[in-house]
């Protein structure tokens, strides 16, 4: 096992806006193992979304490369799923058809009847797992925010991607729903051994979900700290009350404050 | 809103409740009871009709300016018996829908292209902007010159009158399909064609149907202009000719009929919209 599940080497992305060049991401190097959950935190504009776009294959780096299992990323692929801050479900499709959207596309490309049937069943299972089975025929606009976000996660997991990319997916949810979703996400991803890159503004969420928390700083966007979260893999509501948890949270916050105070004077 | 003096016997809270209920009828973007909505609609039509009846039967206005409702009805019967009415209705509908459908066939593809590919918007958008302000009736002499005096120039005029606006509106509608949805589809592995078919087209459809509904109205407003071109039948033609003979009752009849057709088509379009796109209805979630 030489190759990492997700690897970034010297990854740089600059945006030319007028005469100025914004270095959204500078020489980022990152190695993420299989089934690892890595959380990205950092002030606005530090390149978190930029990194996710690159990993999703929606954008191309100015310099450097990204690999999945040693293979360079060129455009989007079924090996990666993405969940957005807004649920981004297709309003004209029922929940179930939304979740099967990716499968439908796969079906038109190849004709693996048997494995397709398995994936379809897997979709239905996931819907059931997240409590959306009774709502499978509803349109997204008929669901609550939390339900929509669950559907978004199921849609991203439907094709069994190796890597799940999440950009502040729970930012718009209330505290209770948010906690439920965090626990659900950990469960689902552990079952499928999914590698997760999770962007959040909430340090507590980052420590709760992550095996590692990367702290980033803006202008230019860089990773300034890589904090290992040495907590037991199985996490529940009580985890957040533990002393270890609070200590790690404090460590991440320290890094963040440092980033903030450095970033402030330069404007 | 002053409290109505009709509930002097009710308790204070009763009056407050009525007041609150009345205030809710004027709340911004909130649903109101169906019965209220319907009675407001019918009430407006009835009071306008009542005003018309009062002014005409009461001879507030000279009959040559304002015919009576019965006068208009009688005229309708006469024209029907002379086999003019149905013929006029038919030929005008054919003209309007021919021109309109031609515009639809041109505007939807052009609008979709302009809305989604920069190279087409570079070609189409400025050109439509250029055409948009041109007065449609000014094309009549050219149309007669090029297309003669049969049906074609009339249909072309309605086509010209609607196609520009329709293209611009379809372009706007398709541009409104959220970039986020397109990104989501890309991440799920959709290629350009699939994004176009499964996301942009699907997401634009309700807006396109709305655009068609609005533009059918525009098409009808060009009818009278179109029938300036050497027509000898049709609703627009009949209206123009009746002016010469001071037949205000015919003018009233035909204008009202066009309005009635408008209500019917509008209703059908809305019905279709609700039936075809249940997901895009306001207040779906209740
Ligand atoms: N398409 C673009 N064109 C120009 N500049 C961009 C573009 N996308 C991002 N940027 C710039 O790159 C930098 C990083 O943006 P990015 O969206 O990755 O930040 P972020 O960490 O996700 O911030 P937030 O927490 O607010 O979502 C910002 O300065 C932003 O202005
Ligand atoms: Mg972002």
Language model: regions and residue ranges:
Chain A
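Conserved ABC ATPase signature
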Residues: 139-143, 147
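Helix-to-loop junction immediately C-terminal to a conserved catalytic motif
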Residues: 56
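Short helical segment in ABC ATPase nucleotide-binding domains corresponding to the A-loop/adjacent helical element
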Residues: 96-105, 120, 228
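A short, proline-enriched helix->beta-strand linker immediately N-terminal to the Walker B motif
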Residues: 158-162
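The feature captures the beta-strand-to-loop junction immediately N-terminal to the Walker
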Residues: 41-43
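Conserved ABC transporter NBD signature motif
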Residues: 64-76
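Conserved ABC ATPase "signature" region
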Residues: 104-107, 111-135, 187
């Amino acid at each position: 096992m030489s190759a990492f599940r997700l690897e970034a080497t010297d990854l740089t992305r600059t945006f030319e806006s007028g005469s100025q060049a914004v270095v959204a991401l500078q020489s980022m190097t990152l190695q993420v193992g299989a089934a690892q959950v890595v959380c990205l935190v950092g002030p606005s504009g530090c390149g978190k979304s930029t990194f996710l776009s690159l990993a999703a294959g929606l954008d191309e780096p100015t310099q450097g490369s990204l690999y999945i299992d040693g293979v360079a990323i060129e455009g989007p692929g079924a090996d990666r799923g993405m969940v957005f801050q807004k649920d981004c479900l297709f309003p004209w499709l029922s929940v179930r058809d939304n979740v099967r959207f990716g499968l439908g596309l796969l079906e038109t490309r190849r004709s693996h009847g048997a494995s397709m049937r398995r994936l379809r069943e897997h979709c239905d299972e996931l819907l059931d797992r997240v409590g959306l089975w009774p709502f499978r025929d509803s349109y997204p606009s008929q669901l609550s925010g939390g339900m929509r976000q669950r559907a978004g996660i199921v849609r991203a997991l439907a094709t069994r991607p190796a890597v799940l990319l999440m950009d502040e997916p729970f930012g718009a949810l209330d505290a209770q729903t948010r906690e439920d979703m965090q626990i659900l996400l950990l469960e689902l991803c552990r079952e499928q051994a999914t590698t997760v890159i999770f962007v959040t503004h909430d340090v507590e969420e980052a420590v709760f979900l992550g095996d590692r928390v990367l702290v980033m700083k803006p202008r230019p966007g860089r990773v300034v700290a890589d904090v290992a979260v040495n907590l037991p893999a199985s996490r529940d509501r009580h985890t957040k009350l533990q002393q270890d948890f609070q200590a790690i949270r404090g460590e991440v916050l320290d890094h963040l404050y440092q980033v903030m105070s450095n970033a402030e004077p330069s404007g | 809103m002053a409290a109505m003096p009709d509930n002097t016997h009710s308790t204070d809270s009763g009056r407050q409740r009525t007041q609150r209920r009345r205030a809710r009828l004027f709340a911004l973007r909130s649903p109101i009871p169906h019965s209220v909505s319907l009675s407001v609609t019918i009430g407006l039509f009835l009071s306008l009709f009542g005003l018309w009846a009062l002014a005409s039967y009461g001879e507030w206005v000279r009959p040559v300016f304002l015919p009576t409702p019965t006068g208009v009805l009688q005229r309708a019967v006469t024209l029907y018996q002379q086999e003019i009415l149905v013929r006029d209705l038919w030929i005008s509908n054919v003209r309007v829908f021919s021109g309109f459908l031609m515009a639809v066939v041109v505007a939807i593809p052009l609008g979709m292209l302009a809305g989604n590919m920069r190279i087409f918007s570079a070609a189409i958008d400025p050109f439509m902007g250029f055409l948009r302000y041109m007065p449609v009736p000014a094309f009549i002499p050219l149309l007669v010159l090029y297309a003669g005096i049969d049906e074609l120039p009339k249909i072309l005029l309605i086509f010209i009158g609607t196609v520009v606006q329709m293209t611009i509106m379809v372009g706007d509608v398709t541009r409104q399909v959220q970039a986020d949805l397109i990104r989501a589809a890309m991440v799920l592995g959709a290629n350009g064609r699939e994004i176009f078919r499964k996301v942009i087209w699907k997401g634009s459809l309700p807006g396109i149907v709305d655009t068609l509904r609005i533009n059918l109205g525009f098409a009808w407003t060009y009818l009278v202009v179109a029938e300036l071109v050497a027509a000898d039948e049709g609703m627009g033609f009949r209206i123009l000719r009746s002016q010469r003979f001071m037949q205000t009752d015919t003018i009233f009849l035909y204008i009202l009929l066009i309005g009635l057709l408008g209500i019917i088509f509008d209703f059908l379009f809305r019905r279709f919209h609700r039936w075809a796109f249940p997901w895009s209805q306001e207040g779906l979630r209740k």
